[in-house]
């Protein structure tokens, strides 16, 4: 597809993602989503993160929606999972989030949720693409009766935090938490959430100015929170990303606890209480071998998917699992929400710490992360590279040397002409040797001479 990637439509604000395109997306997307709407007129929720281009794109998108007769409810600044939850709560026909998640400030994106709170299917996205690509706009253009209306729905934020508070059985009194809001969508919500739950908390990166979202902070820069946790003497730290769908934690010593470890800690806790469906956690191929070893030792099963939270959610829905996610901090608790939810993940983790009385460092120590190295190689043909006999031989040779105590993953990039060679092994030295052994063969066989 030309416009839609794995996470909606993305681009550089005011360039590849222009207000003109946002207007068209409002018209075409709104029209497709409301063909089968249960409400007449159709109702759509719209929200954005804190980046400066959000307001420009939001106004254009809303104009497009109104022009095809849609009743629009504006949430203002809200998290992506907040939109997914509120669409279901309000019985809306769709939700639209304007955000480029953890990307830098110049990027932005527009992603759609169906009435069930799940990201759109490929089929729906293809329908929207077809209308966007069409030479002429044949969609309705009412002049008076039949135009849409716009209402504020700022109380949605309170409803969302109240819902989050009900996902854990106890308050957080007696806990000292450090919070990094990435200067993004969670900035205005976290203080209310932790204050309501009685926690003692310190916040950083919760003053968005439109330009500082994700800038050296948040889940993609957890070292900032690690320093802050030690400085404040907190027992745990949680960092979110720009649109609040990721969470990375930090223990009391300033050590980073990634999505793999968070999934394990929460999954094991639920399993011991008979609440982890099929005793299974859904992971992606990028999860560390240390996670799988820890799961095996605790009689937990795993199901692997391609990289991307949408594939994790697909597998969870298809086979009835309730916990899954990615190393990057997208963790999905399907009992509560339909997508990765950073604040929800933080609460589940904090609840385990409180209920078990253990330190986060103790809980995370069960997953012994193996050193990992990733090399990207520019190739002439990424698909042919995977079928190349000499490359296959090199991979088999390395796997033989590992003898089950490590792993290799060779996969093409989804967006560029790159082959990604990743290995995990007991020591950094070993992992480097293994990666280079395969990378050298890839270079010799299919490399681009620059």
Curated annotation (Swiss-Prot):
Top EC class of this enzyme: isomerase
Pfam families: PGM_PMM_I, PGM_PMM_II, PGM_PMM_III, PGM_PMM_IV
Residue numbers annotated as active site: 101
Cellular component terms (Gene Ontology): cytosol
EC number of this enzyme: 5.4.2.10
Molecular function per GO: magnesium ion binding; phosphoglucosamine mutase activity; phosphomannomutase activity
Catalytic function, reaction form: alpha-D-glucosamine 1-phosphate = D-glucosamine 6-phosphate
Keyword Phosphoprotein assigned: yes
Phosphoserine PTM positions: 101
Obligatory cofactor(s): Mg(2+)
GO BP field: carbohydrate metabolic process; peptidoglycan biosynthetic process; UDP-N-acetylglucosamine biosynthetic process
InterPro entries xref list: A-D-PHexomutase_a/b/a-I, A-D-PHexomutase_a/b/a-I/II/III, A-D-PHexomutase_a/b/a-II, A-D-PHexomutase_a/b/a-III, A-D-PHexomutase_C, A-D-PHexomutase_C_sf, A-D-PHexomutase_CS, Alpha-D-phosphohexomutase_SF
PTM summary: Activated by phosphorylation.
Alphabetic keyword roster: Isomerase, Magnesium, Metal-binding, Phosphoprotein
Cofactor comment: Binds 1 Mg(2+) ion per subunit.
Highest taxon in the source lineage: Bacteria
Binding site for Mg(2+): 101, 241, 243, 245
Record family assignment: Belongs to the phosphohexose mutase family.
Main function: Catalyzes the conversion of glucosamine-6-phosphate to glucosamine-1-phosphate.
Record's protein name: Phosphoglucosamine mutase
Originating species: Ligilactobacillus salivarius (strain UCC118) (Lactobacillus salivarius)
Gene name linked to the record: glmM
């Amino acid at each position: 597809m030309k416009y839609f990637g794995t996470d909606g439509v993305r681009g550089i604000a005011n360039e590849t993602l222009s207000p003109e395109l946002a207007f068209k997306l409002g018209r075409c997307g709104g029209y497709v989503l409301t063909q089968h709407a249960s409400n007449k007129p159709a109702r759509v929720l719209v929200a954005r993160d804190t980046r400066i281009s959000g307001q420009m794109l939001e106004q254009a998108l809303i104009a497009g929606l109104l022009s095809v007769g849609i009743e629009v409810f504006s949430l203002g600044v809200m998290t992506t999972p907040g939109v997914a939850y509120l669409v279901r709560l309000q019985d809306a026909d769709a939700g639209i989030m304007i955000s480029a998640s953890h990307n830098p400030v110049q990027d932005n994106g527009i992603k759609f949720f169906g009435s069930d709170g799940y990201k759109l299917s490929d089929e729906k996205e293809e329908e929207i693409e077809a209308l966007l690509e069409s030479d002429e706009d044949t969609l309705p253009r009412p002049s008076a009766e039949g135009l849409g209306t716009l209402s504020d729905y700022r109380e949605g934020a309170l409803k969302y935090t109240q819902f989050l508070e009900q996902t854990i059985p106890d308050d957080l009194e007696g806990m000292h938490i450090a919070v990094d809001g990435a200067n993004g969508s969670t900035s205005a919500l976290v203080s209310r959430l932790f204050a309501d739950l009685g926690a003692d908390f310190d916040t950083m990166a919760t003053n968005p100015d439109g330009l500082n979202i994700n800038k050296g902070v948040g889940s993609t820069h957890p070292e900032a929170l690690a320093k802050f946790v030690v400085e404040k003497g907190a027992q745990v730290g949680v960092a979110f990303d720009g649109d609040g769908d990721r969470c990375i934690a930090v223990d009391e010593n300033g050590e980073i606890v990634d999505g793999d470890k968070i999934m394990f800690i929460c999954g094991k806790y639920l399993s011991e209480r008979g609440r982890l469906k099929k005793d299974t956690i859904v992971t992606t191929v990028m999860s560390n071998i240390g996670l799988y070893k820890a799961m095996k030792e605790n009689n937990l099963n795993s199901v692997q998917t391609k990289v991307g939270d949408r594939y994790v959610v697909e597998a969870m829905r298809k086979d009835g699992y309730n916990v899954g996610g990615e190393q990057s901090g997208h963790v999905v608790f399907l009992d509560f929400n339909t997508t990765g939810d950073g604040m929800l993940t933080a609460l589940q983790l904090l609840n385990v710490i409180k209920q078990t009385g253990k330190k986060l460092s103790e809980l995370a120590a069960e997953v012994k992360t193996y050193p990992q190295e990733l090399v990207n190689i520019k190739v002439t043909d990424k698909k042919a590279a995977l079928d190349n006999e000499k490359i296959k031989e090199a991979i088999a040779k390395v796997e033989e040397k590992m003898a089950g105590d490590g792993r290799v993953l060779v996969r093409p990039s989804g967006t560029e002409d790159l082959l990604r060679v990743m290995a995990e092994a007991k020591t950094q030295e070993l992992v480097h040797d293994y990666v280079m052994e395969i990378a050298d063969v890839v270079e010799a066989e299919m490399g681009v001479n620059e």
